[in-house]
């Protein structure tokens, strides 16, 4: 049995999985009928896995969001997009591999798709810069969004980054300016924009393609202003305090839904999207098509106004004695 990537909180399942594999080998090598015993163990393992993943802490959800086999932007595109054509370059001499984009069809509907792309192993992660886009990546994304706006193509973005690349060269090339321009221009787009946090949604790197009419996120994805490790280092001068920081930052789907930051939290199979990627793809496609049907019925001025109001409603400062919730109506 090939060893799979295990989280510490999944260790209680190891013994059960070993028993299941032993029974499968026994069934292959003998005439003994073990189907009933195998079914019982598989049912027990599935139930325990579901119990474990329903009780994950914010710090544990971060681990799931960073799983190396979690479906990536290109994985989702291959699952539900027809006639995908990747488009390259920012027309300023750069073609960032940490942020990919192109045109394709979902059913009969043509769309533009943009997303962060991590690697599966060290070599690929180095090539993709661990999903941390450079200024060239955000300028490429803006070029493609301008293209979509011109040809009236709905825009779908997939967020999965620990943050924008913060190296010296990125700063020299105007990382902050590139992200800021994207924020400004995305508010002006005349087409529907749907963003989905498929893994990590970290800081300005996520916001650079995250100004959307609908913001979705998967159940075990995270969306945060800073990584818990960075937050703990800043506040407590101790990265070991990351679990406490993760809880305080309100980075999980239910918290963000309650705060009015995200519009829908998409369910994941027990074990996370890496456990059943095709099922995750079906869930995401259904949600995208449903929200597109709603947004395409709006006029351009209605779309822009709703997008503006959505973001203006975030981050209100309230008087402690006020009975207001600060949530959008």
Swiss-Prot record:
Pfam families: ACCA. GO terms for molecular function: acetyl-CoA carboxylase activity; ATP binding; carboxyl- or carbamoyltransferase activity. Its EC number is 2.1.3.15. Pathway: Lipid metabolism; malonyl-CoA biosynthesis; malonyl-CoA from acetyl-CoA: step 1/1. It is found in: Cytoplasm. Its main location: cytoplasm. One of its GO terms (cellular component) is acetyl-CoA carboxylase complex. It catalyses: N(6)-carboxybiotinyl-L-lysyl-[protein] + acetyl-CoA = N(6)-biotinyl-L-lysyl-[protein] + malonyl-CoA. PROSITE patterns: COA_CT_CTER. Keywords: ATP-binding, Cytoplasm, Fatty acid biosynthesis, Fatty acid metabolism, Lipid biosynthesis, Lipid metabolism, Nucleotide-binding, Transferase. It is an enzyme of class 2 (transferase). GO terms for biological process: fatty acid biosynthetic process; malonyl-CoA biosynthetic process. Belongs to the AccA family. HAMAP family: AcetylCoA_CT_alpha (MF_00823). Acetyl-CoA carboxylase is a heterohexamer composed of biotin carboxyl carrier protein (AccB), biotin carboxylase (AccC) and two subunits each of ACCase subunit alpha (AccA) and ACCase subunit beta (AccD). Component of the acetyl coenzyme A carboxylase (ACC) complex. First, biotin carboxylase catalyzes the carboxylation of biotin on its carrier protein (BCCP) and then the CO(2) group is transferred by the carboxyltransferase to acetyl-CoA to form malonyl-CoA. This is Acetyl-coenzyme A carboxylase carboxyl transferase subunit alpha. The gene is accA.
């Amino acid at each position: 049995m090939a060893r799979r990537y295990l989280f510490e909180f999944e260790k209680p399942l190891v013994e059960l999985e070993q028993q299941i594999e032993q029974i499968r080998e026994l069934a292959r090598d003998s005439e003994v009928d073990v189907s009933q015993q195998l079914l019982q163990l598989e049912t027990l393992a599935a139930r325990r896995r579901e119990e474990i993943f329903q009780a994950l802490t914010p710090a544990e959800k971060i681990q799931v969001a960073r799983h190396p086999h979690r479906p990536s932007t290109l994985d989702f595109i291959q699952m539900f997009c027809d006639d995908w054509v990747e488009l390259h370059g920012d027309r300023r001499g750069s073609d960032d591999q940490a942020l990919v984009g192109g045109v394709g069809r979902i059913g009969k509907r043509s769309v533009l798709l943009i997303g962060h792309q991590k690697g599966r192993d060290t070599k690929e992660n180095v090539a993709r810069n661990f999903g941390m886009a450079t200024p060239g990546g955000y300028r490429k994304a803006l070029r493609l969004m301008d293209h979509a706006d011109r040809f009236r193509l709905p825009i779908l973005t997939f967020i999965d980054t620990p943050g924008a690349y913060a190296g010296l060269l990125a700063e020299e090339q105007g990382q902050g300016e590139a992200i800021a321009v994207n924020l400004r221009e995305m508010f002006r787009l005349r087409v529907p924009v749907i963003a989905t946090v498929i893994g990590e949604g970290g800081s300005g790197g996520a916001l650079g393609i995250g100004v959307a009419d609908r913001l979705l996120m998967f159940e075990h994805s995270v969306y945060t202003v800073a990584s818990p490790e960075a937050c703990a280092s800043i506040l407590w001068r101790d990265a070991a305090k990351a679990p406490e920081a993760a809880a305080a930052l309100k980075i999980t789907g239910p918290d963000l839904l309650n705060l009015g930051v995200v519009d829908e939290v998409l369910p994941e199979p027990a074990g996370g999207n890496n456990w059943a990627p095709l099922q995750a793809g079906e869930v995401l496609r259904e949600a995208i098509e449903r929200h597109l049907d709603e947004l395409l019925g709006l006029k351009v001025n209605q779309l822009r106004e709703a997008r503006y109001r959505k973001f203006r409603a975030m981050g209100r400062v309230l008087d402690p004695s006020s009975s207001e919730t600060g949530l959008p109506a």
